[in-house]
Amino acid sequence: PAEYSVEADAADFEVGTQMDEISGALVQISKGSGLIKRCPVEGCGRALSKQNLCPVHEIQNNYVYDMRIKAVVDDGHKAYNVLFGRELTEEISGMNMDEAIDIGTSSPLGLDEVLVQMTERLCGRYVRCKGSMFDNRLMVKSVEFVKYDASEVAALMNRAGEFVSQEGEL
C-alpha cells in the first residue's frame, strides 16, 4: 500500500470576536424548543427523539434534560433563525429547568406543554439578540426585550403616512 504524509506550514489564525446583532419580532418558536432530552453518552449530547432515540447511540433511557429555544426573528426585511441555550432560555421565558421538568412530566402533552407555554409567552415579543452567525443561524449570546415608546411609534407611522401621500398608492 502507498504511504502518504502531510506537512502543514505553521500559521497564525485570528479568531473573530465580532458579534452580530439582530432586532425584530419573535415570529416563531420552532419544534424542538423548550424542554428537551439529550444523549448522555460522553461527547455526544445530541437531542433525542420523543422515543429517546439518539441518531448515533440508539435508545437512551438515562437521558439528560436541557432547555433551548430555536426561533425565527423577523426584522421587517429578513427572517433570521436564532438559537438560545439553556441560560438565555430560562431568562427570557421566565421558566427555570425545575419548573420545565415539572410541567413536562405532569402534563398530558408531555414536553410539548413546555413548548406551548414558551410560545404563548414569547411569540410576538420584540427582542435584540447578539451572537455569532453559524451555518445561517445566530447562536445567541445575549438578548434583551425591546420596548417601543408610543410617541416613537406614532412618529414612525406619521412618516410612513407622509411617504405614502408623496409617492401615491403603493
Q: How should each PLM-predicted stretch be described?
A:
Residues 1-170:
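Primarily single-stranded nucleic-acid-binding OB-fold modules
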